[in-house]
Amino acid sequence: MSLLATLGLELDRALLPASGLGWLVDYGKLPLAPAPLGPYEVLGGALEGGLPGGGEPLAGDGFSDWMTERVDFTALLPLEAPLPPGTLPPPSPAPPDLEAMASLLKKELEQMEDFFLDAPLLPPPSPPPPPPPAPSLPLPLPLPTFDLPQPPTLDTLDLLAVYCRSEAGPGDSGLTTLPVPQQPPPLAPLPSLSRPAPYPSPASTRGDRKQKKRDQNKSAALRYRQRKRAEGEALEGECQGLEARNRELRERAESVEREIQYVKDLLIEVYKARSQRTRSA
């Protein structure tokens, strides 16, 4: 309510002339509002029949108390000290110069452009080196065969023995003829040692695959022929059984047909005999 009263007083002061403002209350001479009381003090004053702050209850209804309520207008005064009359307020800070800011921004952009233009261009990245080739196993080479040299023939010894025998003559028995050494038989060449390849050659592998495929085709064709032969034999046996059943049914039908014909002939004879009897009677 105090705020409404203050606004009303300010409005009246602004609207009324200066001569009619003598009855207004001086804000500075109003007494200060009492200090706020604690909850126990308010409760004690209410129990004793008085108002908080030692005041006495006002006469009249409860809606007219705000008209006589004391208001502290010091809380509405500005916190800053009022300026003396004739002094100007401090100048507000000047707004930033837009042209100066634009020029600074343009300079920064030019510096950045010069920096990027002066920077050396990086060479294009070199392509990655090709991966090393996979290690391949060398093909096994056959081991070389070593042929032992043949021992030299002893032709020279044979000639020496013949020469000594001719020099000695037939009557000289003091010299003994040297035995002719026997030539050793030639050594047989060693068999070549060849170890098997660690893996089959591609040609043999391809041939094995073809042979395996051919065997599979032969076995599949054989199974197909056997299955068809079994199915044909089963169908043939069923056909023979049906033919035998058909012959049996045909014989029974023929016998029934003969019986029917016999009955017909019998009925015809009975009819003829009866007609003759009626004529004679």
Swiss-Prot record:
One GO MF annotation is:
RNA polymerase II transcription regulatory region sequence-specific DNA binding
Query: In UniProt terms, what is the effect of altering residue 29 to R?
Result: Not acetylated by EP300
Annotated region described as Interaction with PTP4A1, given as residue ranges:
119-216
* Pfam annotation, one family: bZIP_1
N6-acetyllysine found at: 29
Key words of the record: Acetylation, Activator, Cytoplasm, Cytoskeleton, DNA-binding, Nucleus, Phosphoprotein, Transcription, Transcription regulation, Ubl conjugation
Carries keyword Cytoplasm? Answer: yes
SUPFAM superfamilies named in the record: Leucine zipper domain (SSF57959)
Q: How is it modified after translation?
A: Ubiquitinated by CDC34 and UBE2B in order to be degraded by the proteasome. Acetylated at Lys-29 by EP300, the acetylation enhances the interaction with CEBPB, DNA-binding and transactivation activity.
Subcellular location field: Cytoplasm; Nucleus; Cytoplasm, Cytoskeleton, Microtubule organizing center, Centrosome
- Pro residues composition bias: residue spans: 121-143
Give me the Gene Ontology terms describing cellular component: centrosome; cytoplasm; nucleus; RNA polymerase II transcription regulator complex; transcription regulator complex
The principal localisation class reads cytoplasm
Expression triggers: Down-regulated during neuronal differentiation. Down-regulated by pro-apoptotic stimuli.
Keyword Nucleotidyltransferase in record = no
Cite the residue spans of the region called Leucine-zipper.
235-249
Phosphoserine: residues carrying this PTM: 255
Enumerate the residue ranges of region (Required for protein stabilization induced by IL1B).
1-21
Q: Subunit composition?
A: Binds DNA as a dimer. Interacts with PTP4A1/PRL-1. Interacts with CCND3, but not with CCND1 or CCND2. Interacts with HSPA1A or HSPA1B; the interaction protects ATF5 from degradation via proteasome-dependent and caspase-dependent processes. Interacts (via C-terminal region) with NPM1 (via C-terminal region); the interaction leads to loss of association between HSPA1A or HSPA1B and ATF5 and promotes ATF5 degradation via proteasome-dependent and caspase-dependent processes. Interacts with NLK; the interaction stabilizes ATF5 at the protein level in a kinase-independent manner.
Which family does this protein fall into? Belongs to the bZIP family.
Annotated PANTHER family: ACTIVATING TRANSCRIPTION FACTOR ATF 4/5 (PTHR13044), CYCLIC AMP-DEPENDENT TRANSCRIPTION FACTOR ATF-5 (PTHR13044:SF3)
Name of the protein: Cyclic AMP-dependent transcription factor ATF-5
